């Protein structure tokens, strides 16, 4: 099963969770603003994460989500970190659904300050989909 991990992080919290997931999947976690973020081949599972900034997701993540399509992504699994709320999960899920991409209903969320102790939970979550 092919897997990819993409994320956007300003503070490093979402990046840390992405790296835990990627390590479990045996792939690299790639920031959506990197030159190599584009999916060149179809993936069975795309883990995609971001956080809430001023009640929305970052513009880099918004633009990346617009590039995705159902012919490149079998299903998406969403994760987020935020000190404020889980609303980024819904925003990301909605953007993916609007692109015709199947999105798992189960998500992964950590409050920003709890990220340091989240490795085991992130690994357990990732293993459900790989």
Q: Where are each of the predicted segments found?
A:
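Acidic, amphipathic alpha-helical patches
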Residues: 36
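FMN-binding flavodoxin-like domain, especially the glycine-rich phosphate-binding loop
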Residues: 3-4, 9-32, 40-130
């Amino acid at each position: 099963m092919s897997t990819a991990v993409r994320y956007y992080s300003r503070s490093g919290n979402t990046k840390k969770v992405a790296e835990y997931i990627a390590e479990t999947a045996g792939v690299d976690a790639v920031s959506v603003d990197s030159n190599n973020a584009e999916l060149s081949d179809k993936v069975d599972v795309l883990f995609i994460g971001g956080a809430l900034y001023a009640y929305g997701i970052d513009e880099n993540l918004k633009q990346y989500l617009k590039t995705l399509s159902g012919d490149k992504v079998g299903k998406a699994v969403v994760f987020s970190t935020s000190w404020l709320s889980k609303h980024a999960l819904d925003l990301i899920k909605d953007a993916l659904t609007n692109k015709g991409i199947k999105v798992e209903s189960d998500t992964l969320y950590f409050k920003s300050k709890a990220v340091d102790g989240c490795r085991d939970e992130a690994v357990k979550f990732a293993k459900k989909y790989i």
